[in-house]
């Protein structure tokens, strides 16, 4: 979708995504802390079906939500595919951040813009931020291209390193210990 839209279509997509994520934040304000839902709003999780008036969310990962402030998904599930020699480190430094980032409207908005770098469309970051910054709550500082780029660089470093360590774990498991590796790893990811 990102690689086929013109400027007006892209702006409409971002406006649509921002409007749909705003519904999540409204739900959380109305229902929280009883029930709160999280959303990974990156642009690659959305489609605009032909003839539909709004974007549709298609994230295939496990839904993240809280009841009375208590996470309903066992955070340890995120560590199942983490190499065993790294689980303690991931638990200590990353797990909480992964579990909370998608409840924060600003962090979701930054992730939405930063994801355009991963999608090889850096020229769309400024137009996306233009749309996103128009709808930020009054008094909240706008998101800059620099902030989005910095977020992306850190995210890219973390996930590239993580994948490299998973490949090392697969090598050790299959070649050194001659055991079955239980996970399918992606091929080269262009970031």
What does each model-identified segment do?
Residues 86-136:
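A conserved mid-domain beta-alpha-beta active-site/ligand-binding segment of alpha/beta enzyme cores
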Residues 1-18:
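Conserved structural core of kinase catalytic domains
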Residues 33-102:
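Catalytic activation segment of kinase domains across protein kinase-like and atypical kinase folds
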Residues 51-55, 119-191:
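Regulatory N- and C-terminal appendages and interdomain linkers associated
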Residues 14-32:
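A long amphipathic alpha-helix within ATP-dependent nucleotide-binding catalytic cores
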Residues 5-9, 30-33, 69, 104, ...:
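Alpha-helix capping and helix-coil boundary motifs
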